[in-house]
Amino acid sequence: MAGALEGIRILDLSWGIAGPLGVLLLAEQGADVIKVEPPGGDPFRVYDGYKVWTRSRRSVTCDLKSDAGVDAFRKLAATADMLVESLRPGA
């Protein structure tokens, strides 16, 4: 049985607990979630619950501080229906 969000692509730039848990609910409803991580990975990978919070999604590394990384992210964003982020203001 298809989920309610089947066919929806979400880019996940969130970190911590709240963002990934919110996106997890969307993924469990059938959304195609792609987690965009900085080089070196998400700093929250060290926590035991990380694999639970970020299940049901694919992951890519993208350096948003480089021109090549920004270009790659823009191409990826052009294919997405939604973007979830938890960046600090002005980032």
Language model feature labels by segment:
Residues 1-91:
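N-terminal helix-loop segment corresponding to the beta1-alpha1 unit
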